[in-house]
């Protein structure tokens, strides 16, 4: 059975309404199917990844951004060392679909 390497996520900032998650991952890391309970914005700081959302593959690279709707299942496959900030409301949670 293949071991899945997930990107690391840490909260770097938290304000009155929003928080910023730092997401980092090595080439080949994958974030399995999950949702955010509220809308989220991904801003790529470094690297490349493929966001699979609504049946489409969205190629993300440095300086790209994407808006992920609330409760929309999606995955992230990292193609090159990856760093991104994800901005979401403080009470938003990431929930994996098949943990």
Where are these regions (language model features)?
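Short histidine-centered beta-strand/loop micro-motifs
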Residues: 11-13, 22, 30-36, 77-78, ...
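Short, conserved beta-strand element in jelly-roll/cupin
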Residues: 36-50
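Short acidic-glycine-tyrosine-enriched beta hairpin
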Residues: 55-70
